């Protein structure tokens, strides 16, 4: 009887946990939809900034903008975007494995590595690595969006200043890419030098266009200052978009993790009920046997 009572207690406990995971699944789904809307709202800004940089660069094709041209790589920087919370499956671990492979390749090639981490999970992970220098940290908090944006902007500025000063020669960003609700994958993209502005053929063509005045703006300051400011805004917008996309990945992964937990709870409840019924059946069989034995003795 004690075993049956214990099983009933376990069933009730699993049902309570199932209610919690079910509620967390619904909350994650709601947050994911809201974050996807924000993520899609950032993309037009990034695309417009890209177009303007192309036009301004075409008008000042001879200006050696430090954000646009490659140089010998002696030290690199990484901006790694993770989550602040867990319960999102293997989202962070898969990201860390992906970026760690690239970092190890750089270390083997005797290229120094500086890291800016956004999110407590990345901060805790990279703090344990001896060969990686963490130069900036930041966190994104929905409850304090303005403070989070300032903190992230400051962390990104540290990496931009390092690139401008020549302390790092290339800047990468590692984050999760939102493919679908059930699929998210790690992504590593080059932030600096900006590689998605012009190909070699476009540079040659735009130099010819610039002499004919195809692209022209009225600048309040000189064109070099405007182009530098545009490049910085472009990088900041890319990081902001990546943070929102990573947040969407987090909620999608959490939603699926909670759904799996809820489904597993149902399987556990079914198994516990089966065990309970077996115990009851054994008890009833024993009682019947005792009754029959007593009747035979009479």
Swiss-Prot record:
**What's a Gene Ontology MF term here?**
ATP binding
Instruction: Work out whether the entry's keyword set contains NADP.
Output: no
Q: Which UniProt keywords are present, listed alphabetically?
A: ATP synthesis, Cell inner membrane, Cell membrane, CF(1), Hydrogen ion transport, Ion transport, Membrane, Transport
What membrane topology does this protein have? Peripheral membrane protein
Q: InterPro entries recorded for this chain? A: ATP_synth_F1_ATPase_gsu (IPR035968), ATP_synth_F1_gsu (IPR000131), ATP_synth_F1_gsu_CS (IPR023632)
Matching CDD domains: F1-ATPase_gamma (cd12151)
**What Pfam families does the database record attribute to this sequence?**
ATP-synt
Q: Biological process GO terms, please?
A: proton motive force-driven plasma membrane ATP synthesis
Organism's domain of life? Bacteria
GO cellular component labels: plasma membrane; proton-transporting ATP synthase complex
Kindly list the places in or outside the cell where this protein is found, as annotated in its UniProt entry: Cell inner membrane
KW Transport (keyword) present: yes
PROSITE patterns, sorted: ATPASE_GAMMA
Cited SUPFAM superfamilies:
ATP synthase (F1-ATPase), gamma subunit
Q: Which PANTHER family match?
A: ATP SYNTHASE GAMMA CHAIN (PTHR11693), ATP SYNTHASE SUBUNIT GAMMA, MITOCHONDRIAL (PTHR11693:SF22)
What is the role of the protein in this entry? Produces ATP from ADP in the presence of a proton gradient across the membrane. The gamma chain is believed to be important in regulating ATPase activity and the flow of protons through the CF(0) complex.
In the record, the note on similarity to other proteins reads:
Belongs to the ATPase gamma chain family.
The protein's assembly and partners: F-type ATPases have 2 components, CF(1) - the catalytic core - and CF(0) - the membrane proton channel. CF(1) has five subunits: alpha(3), beta(3), gamma(1), delta(1), epsilon(1). CF(0) has three main subunits: a, b and c.
Q: What is this protein called?
A: ATP synthase gamma chain
Which species does the entry assign this protein to? Francisella tularensis subsp. tularensis (strain WY96-3418)
């Amino acid at each position: 009887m004690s075993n049956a009572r214990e099983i009933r207690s376990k069933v009730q406990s699993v049902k309570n946990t199932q209610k919690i995971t079910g509620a967390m699944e619904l909350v994650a789904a709601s947050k994911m939809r809201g974050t996807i809307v924000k993520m899609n709202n950032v993309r037009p800004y990034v695309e417009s900034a890209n177009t303007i940089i192309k036009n301004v660069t075409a008008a000042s094709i001879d200006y050696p903008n430090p954000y646009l041209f490659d140089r010998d790589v002696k030290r690199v920087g990484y901006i790694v975007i993770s989550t602040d919370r867990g319960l999102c499956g293997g989202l962070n671990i898969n990201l860390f494995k992906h970026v760690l492979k690239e970092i190890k390749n750089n270390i083997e090639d005797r290229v120094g590595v500086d890291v800016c981490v956004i999110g407590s999970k990345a901060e805790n992970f990279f703090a344990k690595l001896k060969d990686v220098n963490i130069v900036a940290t930041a966190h994104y908090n929905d409850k304090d969006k303005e403070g989070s944006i300032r903190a992230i902007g400051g962390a990104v500025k540290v990496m931009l200043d390092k690139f401008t000063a020549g302390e790092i020669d290339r800047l990468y960003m590692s984050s999760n890419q939102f493919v679908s609700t059930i699929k998210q994958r790690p992504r590593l993209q080059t932030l600096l030098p900006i590689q998605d502005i012009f190909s070699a053929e476009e540079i040659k063509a735009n130099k010819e266009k610039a002499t004919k005045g195809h692209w022209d703006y009225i600048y309040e300051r000189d064109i070099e200052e405007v182009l530098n400011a545009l490049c910085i805004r472009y990088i900041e917008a890319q990081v902001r978009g990546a943070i929102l996309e990573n947040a969407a990945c987090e909620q999608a992964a959490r939603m699926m993790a909670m759904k799996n937990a809820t489904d597993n709870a149902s399987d556990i409840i079914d198994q516990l009920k089966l065990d309970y019924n077996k115990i009851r059946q054994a008890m009833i069989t024993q009682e019947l046997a005792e009754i029959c034995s007593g009747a035979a003795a009479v």
